[in-house]
Amino acid sequence: MSIRAIIVDTAGTTTDLNFIQDVLFPYSRKAMAEFLEQNQHNVVVDYCISDVKDIALEPDATLERVTEILQQWIDEDRKLTPLKTLQGLIWKQGYNRVEFTGHIYPDFIDSIERIKEKGIRIYSFSSGSVEAQKLLFSHTEAGDLTGSFNGHFDTRTGNKLDKQAYCNICNTISLKPKQILFVSDVAEELKAAEAAGMTTCQMIRFADQRQAKCKKISSFSELVFD
């Protein structure tokens, strides 16, 4: 069965992990307190603040305490929707101020046209919010790449380590699992996608990565489609 859609992970696959860990995460951590103070009455931000209190089981937490919780979650790299939503909003601020540009590996950029010419749809699936993904792909040194994507998925679709998340994606894009190729650097994510029936491929950007039991590539240029 031929591949009709490719789903790409971001951090470690299309994007350098160091950009996420050394640029985006510290920026959101540093900006969190001021951002919450200035935007606490925004509907989305207010909802996230309430969600943080619920998850932390601290219904009476002050704004200062909520900030501390969020900063702790950043340090722990927690994949929680309110955190990821707030980070996306904060990063939008940074992108708009041109304080950084999104890092995308050149081999992915160079492969986009080839993939699209085959009639294959491109989606991204990340623990970062859909908003954050759009920001990443729209503020690159190669320009705005979002027009090449057919959609984006985040934690609202499910946990990336959970088979059900990939089943949900199949249902959303109306394709059979084997018609979808999932590319990620994380072995546990690939295992979950494989359990859902997807075709999988591991991106090896570094020699010390934990190896998955599937096809491996070190560049998107190595992908071959029928």
Swiss-Prot record:
PANTHER family: ENOLASE-PHOSPHATASE E1
Protein name: Enolase-phosphatase E1
GO molecular-function terms, A-Z: 2,3-diketo-5-methylthiopentyl-1-phosphate enolase activity; 2-hydroxy-3-keto-5-methylthiopentenyl-1-phosphate phosphatase activity; acireductone synthase activity; magnesium ion binding
EC number: 3.1.3.77
The keyword Metal-binding belongs to this UniProt entry's keyword annotation: yes
Subunit structure: Monomer.
Pfam family, one: Hydrolase
Record bears the keyword Calcium: no
Described purpose of this protein according to its UniProt entry: Bifunctional enzyme that catalyzes the enolization of 2,3-diketo-5-methylthiopentyl-1-phosphate (DK-MTP-1-P) into the intermediate 2-hydroxy-3-keto-5-methylthiopentenyl-1-phosphate (HK-MTPenyl-1-P), which is then dephosphorylated to form the acireductone 1,2-dihydroxy-3-keto-5-methylthiopentene (DHK-MTPene).
NCBIfam families, sorted: enolase-ppase, HAD-SF-IA-v1
Catalysis performed (reactions): 5-methylsulfanyl-2,3-dioxopentyl phosphate + H2O = 1,2-dihydroxy-5-(methylsulfanyl)pent-1-en-3-one + phosphate
Species of provenance: Shewanella frigidimarina (strain NCIMB 400)
Cofactor remark: Binds 1 Mg(2+) ion per subunit.
Pathway entry: Amino-acid biosynthesis; L-methionine biosynthesis via salvage pathway; L-methionine from S-methyl-5-thio-alpha-D-ribose 1-phosphate: step 3/6; Amino-acid biosynthesis; L-methionine biosynthesis via salvage pathway; L-methionine from S-methyl-5-thio-alpha-D-ribose 1-phosphate: step 4/6
Any GO BP annotation: L-methionine salvage from methylthioadenosine
Entry similarity comment: Belongs to the HAD-like hydrolase superfamily. MasA/MtnC family.
Swiss-Prot/TrEMBL keywords: Amino-acid biosynthesis, Hydrolase, Magnesium, Metal-binding, Methionine biosynthesis
Cofactor: Mg(2+)
